Design a protein with these regions (language model features):
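Short, solvent-exposed, polar/charged sequence segments at loop or secondary-structure edges
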Residues: 1, 82-124, 132
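Short beta-strand segments enriched in small/hydrophobic residues
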Residues: 41-55
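N-terminal segment of the mature soluble domain
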Residues: 58-105, 199
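Envelope-exposed proteins and targeting segments
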Residues: 13-17, 43-44, 119-123, 134-137
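Edge/loop elements at the starts and ends of beta-strands within beta-rich repeat scaffolds
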Residues: 8-12, 38-43, 130
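Solvent-exposed coil/turn segments that connect beta secondary-structure elements
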Residues: 20-26, 50-54, 127-130, 139-145
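C-terminal/domain-edge helix-coil "capping" segments
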Residues: 18-43, 68-69, 147-199
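Post-signal peptide N-terminal segment of secreted/secretory-pathway proteins
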Residues: 1-28
């Protein structure tokens, strides 16, 4: 086995663990110990990172440090299978930064279909300069339901360490997304067990 990308938080531990095992034996062991689990990978999810830097929206434009963070991030280190648009000419034609910010369903859906993604998240980072201090905030939208699924409080940042702060935001969102996937599927399993008991 190997363990990578370990993350420790209050009452939560996550890591990418690669193991060779007999699935049925492991599942039986977890059941015997009363440990809830879900063993499938999450859906392929298109990440569309936009940065609003002092009221200038940047998606495909260069530089987009928020897009660059996701490009450098190991996309396979999470339960959800994150993918990024390549930024080719047809991507630019399909979806502009304004379209993404306005959550234009059909344009987002078309881009997601191109990348064979079953989900699409618009990750908007706002960077504001207020009284010579920079503030950063992330708001994540589900591109299909148009709902806010994740947000952070406005925090002070320093432009010299902006990349570090953006990296933390990416990690926080990825952890949230993984936890949500596990919770939703544990809920489904528990409902199925309840229904079977009722029958």
């Amino acid at each position: 086995y190997s363990i990578e990308n370990e993350k420790y938080k209050k009452e939560v531990y996550s890591a990418l663990i690669t193991v060779n095992f007999e699935k049925k034996k492991l599942e039986q062991l977890l059941k015997d110990k009363g440990i809830e689990f879900f063993s499938k990978k999450g859906p392929k999810t298109l990440i569309i990172p936009i940065i609003n830097f002092q009221e200038r929206l940047i998606l495909w434009d260069d530089p987009n440090p928020w897009f660059d963070i996701w490009l450098r991030r190991p996309l396979d280190s999470n339960l959800n299978l994150f993918t990024l648009p390549a930024g080719e000419a047809d991507d630019l034609i399909t979806l502009s930064a304004e379209d993404a910010l306005n959550l234009k369903y059909f344009k987002i859906k078309k881009l997601a279909k191109k990348y064979e993604a079953t989900q699409a998240y618009i990750l908007l980072v706002n960077v504001e300069n207020i009284n010579e201090e920079f503030y950063i905030r992330l708001i994540a939208y589900d591109g299909f339901t148009q709902e806010i699924i994740f947000s952070t409080k406005k925090e002070v940042t320093d432009v010299t360490v902006l990349n570090n702060d953006l990296n933390k935001l990416a990690d926080n969102f990825a952890d949230f997304s993984d936890n949500l996937w596990v919770k939703d599927n544990l809920d489904i399993i528990n409902k199925e067990l309840t229904m079977i008991a009722e029958v």
